[in-house]
Structures are given as structure tokens and as C-alpha cells.
């Protein structure tokens, strides 16, 4: 038996190391079952965490990932197969549209409605300055 000296000079004759146990590993199905149980009623998250011996923060992390639809999905990081195709010549035939379709259709009031990719709409008159309209549309595209 080894004897250790303490900070104050006292001798320590016994030293006990307490093991906290091994880390629990839950399968995806177990996690989903625990999360479903935690959603069963008001105040069930804390009780469920205590029942399974996990922290509330871990259970809340699982609950958040389930709400966001991230839980139980496979990771998609990594490489994807790539194919190198031989370069081939494909002739292109130019087709002219019928004469009836060549003229743009004008609305009776001369107004246009432009919808940006983010859903914002701009209604302009037919005499709008194109450069100014482009600046406005670029500005609207940056707004999210």
C-alpha cells in the first residue's frame, strides 16, 4: 500500500477512485422513442430525462433535431460518383417562332408586374428606365 502526503502534511493512507460508469450509447430508434415520450405532456421532458439517466440539455438537443427533421437521417457528406462523358458533336437546329408569337403581348394599361425570386413584386409602367429597374431588382434580390 502506498501512502501519500496531503497538502497540509497529513498522510493519506487510502485513495479511492470512483468510476462514473461507461457512456451510454442510444440507437436512433431508442432516441426517437425517448423523444416521443418526452413530448407526451407538459413537464414530461425533465421526467423523461431523469428516467433514462440523461441530461435535460441532451434531451432538448434530440428534441430540436427531431423538430428540424435532422434526426435519423444519414449524413450526406463525402464524395459522389462522377462520370466523364466523351465529347460529342450534337447539331443544333435553329427554329424560328411563328409570326403571331413574335410580338410581346402588352397589357391595356401599359403596366408590368415583375416577381423577384424571393417573392417581392414590382409593378412598373411601360416607360420605365431599364437601367434603373435593373438596379431596383438587384437590390430586391439581396433582401431576404
Swiss-Prot record:
InterPro entries: Transposase_8 (IPR002514), Trp_repressor/repl_initiator (IPR010921), WH-like_DNA-bd_sf (IPR036388). The keyword Cell inner membrane does not apply. Transmembrane segments: none annotated. One of its GO terms (biological process) is DNA transposition. It comes from the Bacteria. This is Uncharacterized protein y4hN. GO terms for molecular function: sequence-specific DNA binding; transposase activity. Gene3D superfamilies: Winged helix-like DNA-binding domain superfamily/Winged helix DNA-binding domain. NCBIfam families: IS66_ISRel24_TnpA. Keywords: Plasmid. Belongs to the transposase 8 family. Pfam families: HTH_Tnp_1.
Amino acid at each position: 500500500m502506498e501512502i501519500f502526503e496531503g497538502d497540509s502534511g497529513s498522510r493519506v493512507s487510502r485513495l479511492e477512485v470512483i468510476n462514473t460508469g461507461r457512456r451510454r450509447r442510444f440507437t436512433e430508434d431508442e432516441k426517437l422513442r425517448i423523444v416521443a415520450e418526452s413530448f407526451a405532456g407538459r413537464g414530461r421532458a425533465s421526467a423523461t430525462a431523469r428516467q433514462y439517466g440523461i441530461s435535460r440539455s441532451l434531451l432538448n438537443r434530440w428534441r430540436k433535431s427531431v423538430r428540424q427533421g435532422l434526426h435519423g437521417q444519414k449524413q450526406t457528406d463525402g464524395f459522389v460518383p462522377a462520370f466523364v462523358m466523351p465529347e460529342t458533336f450534337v447539331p443544333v437546329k435553329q427554329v424560328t417562332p411563328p409570326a403571331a408569337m413574335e410580338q410581346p403581348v402588352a397589357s391595356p394599361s401599359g403596366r408590368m408586374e415583375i416577381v423577384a425570386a424571393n417573392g417581392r413584386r414590382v409593378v412598373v409602367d411601360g416607360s420605365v428606365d431599364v437601367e434603373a429597374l435593373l438596379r431596383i431588382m438587384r437590390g430586391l434580390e439581396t433582401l431576404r
